[in-house]
Amino acid sequence: MAGMGGRAWLAGLALVGALALLTSGCTGGDAAPNRSTVSVASSAPSTSTAPTSARPTPTVRPYPADVPLTGHNLKPGEKPPLYPAAAKARTQAGANAFAEFFMRTLDWAYATTNPSYMKHYAGPSCGLCAGLATGISKTAAEKHWYLGGRLTIHPATATPIGPVTAPADNCSLVMFDVTAFSTVDRTGKVFSGDGAHTGDRIKLCVKKFDTGWNVTYMAGTK
């Protein structure tokens, strides 16, 4: 992507490097234990039996169990993106819907400093997918986090598979915007970043399996 200085981002850490790959190739600890006490009545227990109530039906989680729900970079009340019904179709339209969804899982990874969600849909042949996930995981391991770098995803369109050689049933072209972003260390110091970008484009090729779509190829494009 000419004029974006994307390759210069490779010198940065984590988000800077990860987003460079995307556009040029294209704390919490354990909860404190409950130490509260419960008072015990001195009177003898009643022999009457309390009426039993029906157990509440457990809420079904609409995304995988390892998808994070918290993060430094989340907006108030923000929820993970949901797999769209349109992506269930084995059609180009279904592939387009899935491509948009996958990019939103990448956005969620930047928001939470956790790539678990996107990794559910990234195939082993997608080198950029693996690189992005590794960069985000490295940031988390260093107790760093991201500020900004949120993606706005525009509607995907069909694009030819060739010259991609990875296994693919369909390919989609996704345009997206990125807000200004930086990486923040454990002390709150901002030590790397870049300005906002608009109109970046990425090619996503996908293959349909019984369990759904997987991304097999991902690269930035002009």
Residue ranges of predicted features:
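Sec-dependent bacterial lipoprotein signal peptides
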Residues: 1-24
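Exposed beta-sheet edge and beta->alpha loop/turn motif
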Residues: 5-8, 27-44, 49, 161-222
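Core segments of small alpha/beta cavity-forming domains
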Residues: 73-147
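A short, amphipathic edge element
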Residues: 142-160
